[in-house]
Amino acid sequence: MTTSARTLLLLRHAKAEPHGKGPDALRRLDPRGWRQSAEIGAGLAAAGLVPELVLVSSAVRARETWEQVAGALGDGPAPEVDLRDELYDAGVEDLIGMLRDIDGRVRTLLVVGHEPTMSATAARLAGSGASGPMNQVRLGLPTAAYARLDVTGPWAGLDHLSAVLREVIRPA
């Protein structure tokens, strides 16, 4: 397996409707969330960060976030999408375990999930990075923000301090 650079994008779902009487997993995006998601998708495309594989939480708001992001990525090859129930309530170690199982041929991976797992995973994996992004992941990712990490080794080798946090991007 090659150890050339990989990119990990940890995206918190976009802004959702308030908690109501129904199950949390069924909350939908609100109008702001729809706009945020499309903006993030367009930004990923413009930055050349179109994923080859996307892991998406089965929660409605995460699926809707991905649908909007995907619609804004452009006309290139569609990423493989893996909808995962276990992402809904995954902790940091659970998510790192999922990431370790990713095929080594995948170079750019997007995870659409929830807080605090997205930011806590970025903080755990990041051995170094600029102080601004590190401070942001320590505080938590706002809705529709993503942490971009460079991973120099294989996915199977992901562990504490095994990636570099490059940036945190959030919609306007």
Describe each model-derived feature in a short phrase:
Residues V106-A126, M134:
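A glycine-rich beta-strand to alpha-helix segment
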Residues L8, T108-L110, Y146:
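Residue-level preference for the first positions of well-ordered beta-strands
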Residues A59-R63, E115-P116, T143:
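Alpha-helix N-cap/helix-start capping motif
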